[in-house]
């Protein structure tokens, strides 16, 4: 596709901001796998009790991805990413904070707290892929989306890789709660970038609209 330099530059800014935000959110999703042994040690929980935190969250994520699609279509990808990332940073922080809530004890009450908080995190996490795809659909012609899909996949793997690279030293040097606090802080930074840098389409930046030639354009020929 023959795009102007201004368009390419603005699209790259949009895409990189979304991509790094998505990676940051993945850090705030896979960090629990690093914290599991420390939760077990701190509270004396077995695998079944840890599973009681993870299983409801997986169910919530699967259902939310289905139900949040229409919401994303209605409010737009930019708002959806802001909602999802803000929720993820809040509930990652609250999960880490649970380690300091001694008044909840170490039994079923604390377990219920962690399970509830992680399920809320999963709900907001479900917005991320929906929002990213929605926004980029307005910036990429249908013939360019193969490249977009490849980069999208790389961002997913990047987020998974980062939490294990960054999270390992965190849990080695700091209390386990920081494996939730640090991703929360990174997501907070990216929310700011999304707010100021991301737009749903070229027309929102004062550029000419792009005919993406998919079903949304009304003419695929």
Language model features by range: what are they?
Residues 156-202:
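Helix-loop-helix hairpin linking two adjacent transmembrane segments in secondary transporters
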Residues 198-221:
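Flexible cytoplasmic inter-helical loops of multi-pass small-molecule transporters
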Residues 86-107:
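C-terminal ends and interior cores of transmembrane alpha-helices
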Residues 91, 105-127:
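Hydrophobic core of transmembrane alpha-helices in multi-pass small-molecule transporters
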Residues 13-47:
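Extracytoplasmic
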Residues 117-157:
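Cytoplasmic helix-loop-helix junction between adjacent transmembrane helices
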Residues 30, 58-66, 160-161:
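Residue-level signature of mid-helix packing/kink "hotspots" within the transmembrane helices
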